[in-house]
């Protein structure tokens, strides 16, 4: 079934029945049938083409910082971009980076060249590709503010460029979520500023994260999208759910907007806890909470 993949990728970049919990910041998830670690855009194109030709399910992810993999795992092929595709180049006030670059590394690189605009990304886990797909943001900044061009592989296997007006960037969403597009690189427009001012903002954001977020536990970041007119953390706290647990899944005592893995949690436990929080929000506030975490895998 996967013979052609074994023909063009070396065995050290192919993993059979790989536990997804080893590739997720939640530290949760069953095995994927086959995980591949491409080192170039061409390899991604070849793998996805093969999967389409053979009608094999294909899941592409970066560093697994915003996913919850179900306990039965993932059928088909998982393409992990976050291990490789890490090139960065800087020209004047623009940065080109491939999808596998860590956001923290990208924001540090910008600061090294006295370029402002990516300070908000300091401390956000995950890769550039995932950040583009969900228009990641924090502390008043988001990817939408800096993206100048994005390259992505289309469903027919071609490489296409997208300008900002074509990306449909919005709060935690983009065209790359809506359509079968695989982000492989981005060009970002920044602006010159004093390096010490940039680093001061980054240090402030990092300090605030350490103080307010449960970074000491595995999680997938903020569990829920922010509904209009509300802040999720205080809302969940007011409902009396701070510290509420289902097995090893827990509403964080430090920040109720985070569901954490407090010890050997299963995906089913996390999903049950999410359902409880959503039901309470509907009952107390008449709000349909939406998850920010992407749930993947076999039910």
From Swiss-Prot:
InterPro entries: FAD-bd_PCMH, FAD-bd_PCMH-like_sf, FAD-bd_PCMH_sub1, FAD-bd_PCMH_sub2, MurB, MurB_C, MurB_C_sf, Oxid_FAD_bind_N. Pfam families: FAD_binding_4, MurB_C. GO terms for biological process: cell division; cell wall organization; peptidoglycan biosynthetic process; regulation of cell shape. Residues 28-193 form the FAD-binding PCMH-type domain. Its EC number is 1.3.1.98. It catalyses: UDP-N-acetyl-alpha-D-muramate + NADP(+) = UDP-N-acetyl-3-O-(1-carboxyvinyl)-alpha-D-glucosamine + NADPH + H(+). The active site is at 172, 222 (proton donor), 292. The keyword Flavoprotein applies. Pathway: Cell wall biogenesis; peptidoglycan biosynthesis. One of its GO terms (molecular function) is FAD binding. Its main location: cytoplasm. It comes from the Bacteria. One of its GO terms (cellular component) is cytosol. Keywords: Cell cycle, Cell division, Cell shape, Cell wall biogenesis/degradation, Cytoplasm, FAD, Flavoprotein, NADP, Oxidoreductase, Peptidoglycan synthesis. Cell wall formation. Belongs to the MurB family. This is UDP-N-acetylenolpyruvoylglucosamine reductase.
């Amino acid at each position: 079934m996967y013979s052609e993949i074994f023909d063009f990728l070396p065995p050290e970049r192919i993993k059979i029945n790989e536990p997804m919990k080893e590739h997720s910041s939640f530290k949760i998830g069953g095995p994927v049938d086959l995980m591949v670690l491409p080192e170039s855009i061409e390899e991604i194109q070849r793998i996805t083409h093969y999967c389409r030709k053979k009608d094999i399910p294909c899941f592409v992810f970066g560093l697994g910082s915003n996913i919850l993999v179900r306990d039965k795992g993932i059928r088909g092929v998982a393409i992990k971009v976050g291990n490789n595709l890490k090139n960065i180049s800087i020209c004047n006030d623009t940065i080109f980076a491939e999808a596998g670059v860590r956001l923290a590394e990208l924001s540090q690189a910008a600061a090294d060249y006295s370029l402002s605009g990516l300070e908000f990304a300091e401390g956000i886990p995950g890769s550039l590709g995932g950040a583009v797909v969900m228009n990641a943001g924090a502390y008043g900044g988001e990817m939408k503010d800096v993206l100048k061009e994005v390259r992505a592989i289309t469903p027919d296997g071609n490489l296409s460029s997208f300008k900002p007006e074509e990306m449909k960037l919005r709060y935690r969403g983009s065209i790359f979520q809506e359509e079968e597009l695989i982000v492989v690189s981005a060009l970002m427009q920044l602006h010159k500023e004093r390096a010490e001012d940039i680093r001061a903002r980054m240090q402030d954001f990092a300090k605030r994260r350490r103080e307010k977020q449960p970074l000491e536990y595995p999680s997938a970041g903020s569990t829920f999208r922010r509904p209009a007119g509300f802040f999720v953390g205080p809302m969940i706290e007011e409902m009396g759910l701070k510290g509420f647990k289902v097995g090893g899944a827990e509403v964080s005592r430090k920040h109720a907007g985070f569901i954490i893995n407090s010890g050997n949690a299963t995906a089913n436990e996390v999903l049950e806890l999410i359902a409880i929080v959503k039901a309470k929000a509907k009952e107390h506030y008449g709000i349909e909470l939406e998850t920010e975490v992407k749930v993947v895998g076999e039910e």
